Amino acid sequence: MTELSRELRIINEKGLHARASARFVETVERFDARATVEKDGERVAGDSIMGLLMLVAPRGSTIRITTSGPDAEPLMQALTDLVGDYFGEGR
């Protein structure tokens, strides 16, 4: 089984808030893979909006994403693109 980890900086103005978390979960659910997100030693499932909100990840914070499963690589790329695109919210 493939497992990948990557650190990403949250760059959108409002951080990992409700709408951004929902987009993150929607992205995870499109793939045959699992994702976990870690910040400051706290780890949550990438398919849990509430879990993502509990991380309290404002702009400028760093999260570690780990993906595993058959689609681990395309999921990691999709999540990297999502974060890099400001969760589709502009800057």
Map each language-model feature to its residues.
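Short amphipathic
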Residues: T2-N12
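Alpha-helical interaction segments
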Residues: E13-G15, Q77
